[in-house]
């Protein structure tokens, strides 16, 4: 249910874009994301940090997009979110000396320290790749291509990378947990 709640504002963004334009779609995205945060708080009595960061960036960059009537702001939001995620993973790994992925999943999954580190770095690199790919698609290809990429391409890439991560985790789990 939570994944659907996170994905719903993106679907609203896409549908409104197809019916109107990117500015109407951006306004709808802001409203849909705010409603998703409110619903999450009402239903679960908590909002994930990642969801809150995403909402703040949607509100700020979406607001700038509408105010200046310039779609570049909302296009940059994707890259900035991925840069923040990658930065958080790398800071956790190198400064705090503990992979953030391990902090998030370590209660459910047991892996050797080197596997956590590699998985953490792999996700950081994935986020960097997605951020750079977004820059290319957003600023070198037509807006409609970027919209399809944002709604279908990035989630598709994330799904594939999540499945590959699952295979990696399975291969490094202790035998008794498999």
UniProtKB/Swiss-Prot annotation:
Annotated transmembrane regions: 22-42, 50-70, 76-96, 121-141, 149-169
GO cellular component annotations of the record: plasma membrane
Lineage top rank: taxon: Bacteria
Pfam families reported in the protein's UniProt record: IspA
Keywords for this protein: Cell inner membrane, Cell membrane, Membrane, Transmembrane, Transmembrane helix
Disulfide-bonded cysteines: none
Membrane topology: Multi-pass membrane protein
InterPro entries: YciB (IPR006008)
Localization: Cell inner membrane
Signal peptide: none
Its job: Plays a role in cell envelope biogenesis, maintenance of cell envelope integrity and membrane homeostasis.
Family: Belongs to the YciB family.
PANTHER family membership: INNER MEMBRANE-SPANNING PROTEIN YCIB, INTRACELLULAR SEPTATION PROTEIN A-RELATED
Name of the featured protein: Inner membrane-spanning protein YciB
């Amino acid at each position: 249910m939570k994944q659907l709640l996170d994905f719903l504002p993106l679907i609203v963004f896409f549908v409104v874009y197809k019916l109107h334009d990117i500015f109407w779609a951006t306004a709808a995205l802001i409203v849909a994301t705010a409603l998703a945060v409110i619903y999450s708080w009402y239903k679960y009595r908590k909002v994930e940090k990642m969801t809150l960061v995403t909402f703040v960036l949607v509100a700020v960059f979406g607001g700038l997009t509408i105010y200046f009537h310039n779609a570049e702001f909302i296009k940059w939001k994707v890259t900035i979110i991925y840069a923040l995620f990658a930065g958080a993973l790398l800071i956790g790994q190198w400064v705090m000396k503990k992979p953030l992925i391990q902090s998030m999943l370590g209660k459910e999954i047991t892996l050797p320290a080197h596997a956590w580190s590699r998985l953490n770095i792999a996700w950081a690199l994935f986020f960097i790749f997605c951020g750079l790919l977004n820059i290319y698609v957003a600023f070198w290809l037509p807006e409609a291509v970027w919209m399809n990429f944002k709604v279908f391409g990035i989630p598709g890439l994330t799904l594939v990378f999540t499945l590959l991560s699952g295979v990696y985790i399975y291969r490094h789990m202790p035998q008794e947990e498999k």
